[in-house]
């Protein structure tokens, strides 16, 4: 097997966590997260090839492209795209698929699609955000929360209550240079 032959080279089995770390750090999509069925969140439709950031690979000039008109119509209506982000500090809470992404004023502009620990030990992820937030270096706020840990509404908080605070992140290059 590959494991037997590769043992002397340090080959080891990896699971889904390894796959997710590698693809997320490389900026690659996973069906159901960054595109395809189940990728739409917060009342939005499922993400297509354009929203996933791969629209430039669609050959709309090919004469036999049956879905050309549907693809182009969807591209004209597209409001956002998947970007890669990074939390600049270690020790922050992991973001999960569906967690809200906010702008600096606290307005929801998208949602997390994936998040994993990168080779430098920082959390790196991908998120679908509105088009005006895709530039590298754009600051984001992410609510990395589990539904059971939302806490009381801010207006109902009392002394000693704990609330969730969004974690600062920044948009980084979608496909990092090697």
What are these regions (language model features)?
Residues 1-178:
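Conserved, structured C-terminal
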